[in-house]
Amino acid sequence: MVRLVSRTIFNEKDMMRKLFFGLLTALILAACSSDPVYHGMTPQQKEDYSKAIAGKYTGTYIIIYNNGLNDAKAVKVENSQMTITDQTMHSVCFHNYPVSQLSRVVADSALAEALACAPNVDFQADYHFYDMQDNGDANWGFEPAAIPLTLHYDGADHHLVLKLNSQTYFLLSKASLDAGKPFANQSVFQFAVAGIYEGNTLLQDFDDFWQDNEFGCLTYFQLNEE
């Protein structure tokens, strides 16, 4: 009799254990099934989406800089312009970017003085569509490469390159694209100066912008509300 009860209790526990793990598996599968499903985009889809985002945009440059005193400050340049091309060029062009603001964070005084007098520049960044969801929402991002500059200081011309990086990615809503407002849900483009080079020589590194007492310059292009 005792053995029978013991066996019955064991069977009930075994059944409860199986039921628990069965329910847990079902919940996991249900959660996984609700996750977005991503897949690649066809050339035609990329072309259509590129046409949907192409155009001229107005916004504000917000340039945040740290001058090495652990005291980040910001400069705003309103009525700034940005152009996005279609799939043929697949580029984002930032217009009249004030590279002179970088002079605030350059350690070399001669270079800083030359930068302070530098005119605004246009520069381009390549963009890419990475994948899309079944509902038509697409992942998109841009990759700024570099800004070439020729500055005269220390009695000579210096051919410099401002290397840039960006970690901004967008989920472009199909509904926003159809409504003609592709960046309604995410309207900030971010990029940073990673370093200043002359040829292969690194003149100054800005990779540690968020570290205390480090020099750095981070730029946001905030689109105006449509």
Residue ranges and their predicted role:
Residues L4, I9-E12, C32-E113, E226:
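Acidic/polar, low-complexity intrinsically disordered N-terminal segments immediately downstream
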Residues E12-L19:
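Positively charged n-region of N-terminal signal peptides that target proteins for export
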Residues G59-Y65, I147-L149, Q190-N200:
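Generic short beta-strand segments
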Residues Y38-M41, L164-E226:
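Edge beta-strand at a domain terminus
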Residues M89-L177:
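Predominantly extracellular/secreted and cell-surface proteins with exposed
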Residues F21-L24:
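Sec-dependent N-terminal signal peptides
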